[in-house]
Regions:
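A contiguous active-site-proximal alpha/beta segment in oxidoreductase catalytic domains
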Residues: 1-44
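Contiguous beta-strand/loop segments that form the cofactor/metal-binding neighborhood of enzyme cores
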Residues: 52-129, 159-170
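C-terminal helix-rich "cap/oligomerization" subdomain common to oxidoreductases
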Residues: 4, 161-195
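Mid-domain beta-loop-alpha active-site segment that forms a flexible
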Residues: 9-18, 40-71, 158, 180
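Active-site loop of classical SDR/Rossmann-like NAD(P)-dependent oxidoreductases
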Residues: 147-160
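Short amphipathic
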Residues: 34-38, 73, 148-149
Length: 195
């Protein structure tokens, strides 16, 4: 009997996100200098806890920048009664900085931005559930828009991957690898200890 465990990070199964990662790694905007993720917990599939919400942003950073971060800092703000209301998480890489902004009862504008030496990629709105992003490339007058159709919230694509894994007798997902999963767990542990 074999059991397959996988994170419910439906974002990594969306074609638009896969294309975004591919184009970023292909230097569409040059060398990546910064990744900025902002997410309002109230907008993110209501009822999710902080760890589930921050996992989406951490996953995006890991997929875009890799698992070899140098340090991570969490700067949580709590209300007078001790409830979490805002956090700014920074992840330092060798030549890149990632910032994750999460708010619960404060207004945070949902956005994912990848800033490079030759331009910027922006995923507006609910970027963890995206079918669309745009790139502003140095020397080009107009934005380049990328749009991909998908149905639902990505769960069907996660289930499709699980069925393929079972059929092929694989235990590792091809969209979020073991090493990435271990890095995510390590980052969550660090953030939860400091928050």
């Amino acid at each position: 009997l074999q059991v397959i465990l996988t994170e419910k990070l439906t974002m990594v199964y969306l074609r638009a996100f896969t294309q975004l990662v591919w184009l970023t790694h292909g230097a569409l905007v040059g060398d990546v200098v910064a990744v900025k993720c902002a997410i309002s917990q109230d907008d993110f599939e209501g009822g999710k806890n902080f760890s589930e919400t921050v996992s989406q942003a951490l996953c995006a950073c890991i997929k875009l920048l890799g698992k070899d971060y140098l340090e991570v800092k969490s700067n949580a703000v709590k209300s007078s009664d001790g409830c979490f209301i805002y956090d700014m998480i920074t992840m330092k890489y060798l030549r890149t900085l990632a910032t994750i902004e999460i708010g619960t009862t404060v207004d945070v504008e949902n956005e994912l931005a990848i800033i490079g030496t030759r331009g910027r990629i922006t995923v507006p709105g609910d970027w963890w559930n995206t079918g669309y992003f745009e790139a502003k490339i140095e020397g080009q007058e107009f934005l380049k828009r990328y749009s991909f159709n998908f149905e639902g919230n990505g769960l069907r694509y996660l289930l499709q991957e699980l069925v393929i894994m079972i059929r092929d007798r694989r235990t590792e997902c091809t969209r979020f690898f073991y090493e990435e999963s271990e890095t995510l767990a390590e980052l969550l542990k660090i953030i939860n200890q400091r928050g």
